[in-house]
Design a protein with these regions (language model features):
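Bacterial Sec-dependent N-terminal signal peptides
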Residues: 1-27
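Peripheral terminal and inter-domain segments
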Residues: 26, 335-437
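Terminal peptide-recognition signature
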Residues: 40, 88, 147, 178, ...
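Extended, small/polar residue-biased N-terminal targeting/export presequences
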Residues: 51-140
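STAS-typified acidic loop motif
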Residues: 134-160, 296
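Short acidic catalytic loops
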Residues: 147-148, 173-185
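A short, well-ordered alpha-helical element
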Residues: 155-174
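Gly/Ser/Thr-rich loop/hinge elements
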Residues: 185-238, 272-278, 289-295, 300, ...
Length: 437
């Protein structure tokens, strides 16, 4: 089945080549409001995925134009575009529908306007210069793979070696976190390519139904596309309110296939692939021309967003996902040493996160000698001297501190409420107890 090609706001508006949208190109001619409204209505009527909504929008825009609601913007195309979009949203809010002004497109024929050869070359160079939007790959403590990814670009063939290198680096991770908190969308072909690395068998994850030409595209996670690289470890996806469109496509497909746990905020709620349509006089309308249908739910995330399995503020999602991974591994651990190792890693996530720095007078409760450990204070800082090796303690929570890069120390009260013992937990899961002298 023929694939659907979509060009998103990311390419055409947010990152348009400078020569396409410079201020010098703005026309000083008066905008013909009624002609513009008629052209917008025609494009919506012919292409919008929901014809009934297109008719409602058209009625409202004609009414607004007839009342003269746009007359004051006839010399300010950017404000006019914003007002028309606001009026569209007052009738039906589709986050993918965007009205913009870009005089660099004036020479294009009305209707669907794919990029020119010059624009396509510019976009291709842009994404290549930005490493196809792969900025970093990282191995976090506890052998957790971490890959932040902000845009699904269309250049799958060119990007494939980069994807394979990034995921190959994480192939021995015990779990993987894909961070889509800043992902605003992109191309379904790239979504499908990335999904393919996480399935052992060909799996249908999304169907896109096109109103314009009645075409339907089926998007599979297909291990045949990955040259033998398959990652089977537990997977966590981080989301935020900014996660949108293609980012939601990836998240929703993985969630419904039960391949990933979603951690973070409800996503933006845009499920409709779009194309840009020139409506004359330098104006463009990004029109959703198709809809997604998940093979499991038979619906999509339009308007509702993707609901996380674990809801948490986006700023806390990375730590939460790591904690979930460690808790799961701790519950499955067969030895006390492995359980303690996971506890060490969990504690390390919360250094200076829970209570911050304790008041100085609180430090004094811990001062003293515990076996070879001499705990003392200098000003508002707490230190440990072990045979001349001095470390500043970093607070985790209440009576728990980081001793150094390989150990944590917890002060334990006796039945009289006095801190009389120090427990040392090492990064390898070792546990040692020292009584206070």
């Amino acid at each position: 089945m023929k694939q659907l090609k979509t060009y998103h706001v990311f390419f055409l508006l947010a990152f348009a080549a400078p020569n396409l949208c410079s201020a010098q190109n703005i026309s000083k001619d008066l905008i013909n409001i009624h002609t513009l409204v008629d052209s917008i209505n025609l494009s919506l009527g012919n292409n919008y995925i929901f014809p009934d909504k297109a008719r409602m929008i058209a009625t409202h825009l004609r009414s607004q134009a007839k009342k003269g609601a746009y007359n004051s913007f006839s010399t300010d195309p950017h404000k006019l575009a914003s007002q028309v979009q606001a009026d569209i949203y007052s009738i039906h809010r589709d986050p993918h529908m965007v009205v913009g002004y870009n005089p660099g497109w004036q020479g294009h024929q009305k209707g669907y306007t794919g990029p020119t050869e010059e624009e396509a070359r510019w976009f291709a160079k842009f994404v290549k210069d930005n490493n196809f939007m792969f900025k970093k790959v990282e191995l976090l403590p506890g052998n957790i793979g971490y890959l932040p990814f902000n845009i699904f670009v269309e250049h799958v063939k060119d990007a494939k070696p980069i994807i394979a290198s990034a995921l190959g680096f994480l192939a021995n991770s015990s779990a993987i976190i894909i961070d889509l908190r800043e992902n605003t969308g992109g191309e379904p072909e790239m979504v499908s390519q990335l999904e393919s690395y996480f399935f052992k068998e060909k799996t249908l994850l999304n169907v896109i139904i096109n109103r314009s030409n009645k075409d339907t595209a089926f998007y599979y996670a297909d291990p045949a596309k990955t040259d033998g690289l398959t990652l089977s470890m537990p997977m966590y996806i981080l989301t935020s309110k900014k996660t949108f469109s293609g980012g939601e496509d990836f998240t929703y497909g993985m969630q419904q296939a039960k391949r990933a746990t979603i951690v973070g905020e409800v996503t933006g709620g845009g499920a409709h692939p779009t194309n840009p349509f020139s409506v004359g006089q330098g104006f463009l309308v990004q029109i959703p021309f198709a809809r997604s249908s998940n093979p499991v739910t038979k619906t999509d995330w339009e308007g509702t967003g993707v609901i996380p399995d674990i809801k948490v503020e986006s700023s806390k999602a990375l730590i939460k996902a790591q904690e979930l991974i460690f808790r799961e591994r701790q519950a499955m651990a067969k030895t006390e040493e492995e359980k303690q190792k996971m506890e060490y890693l969990i504690n390390g996530l919360h250094v200076n996160k829970d209570l911050g720095t304790l008041p100085v007078d609180e430090f004094d409760k811990f001062l003293g000698t515990y076996g070879p450990l001499n705990i003392y204070r200098e000003g508002n800082k707490l230190f440990c001297n072990i045979s001349g090796n001095i470390s500043e303690l970093a607070h985790i929570s209440k009576n728990l501190f980081v001793l150094d890069g390989n150990a944590q120390i917890e002060f334990i009260k006796d039945d009289k409420g006095v801190y009389s013992m120090a427990k040392l937990l090492t990064s390898h899961g070792g546990l040692f107890e020292e009584l206070r002298k």
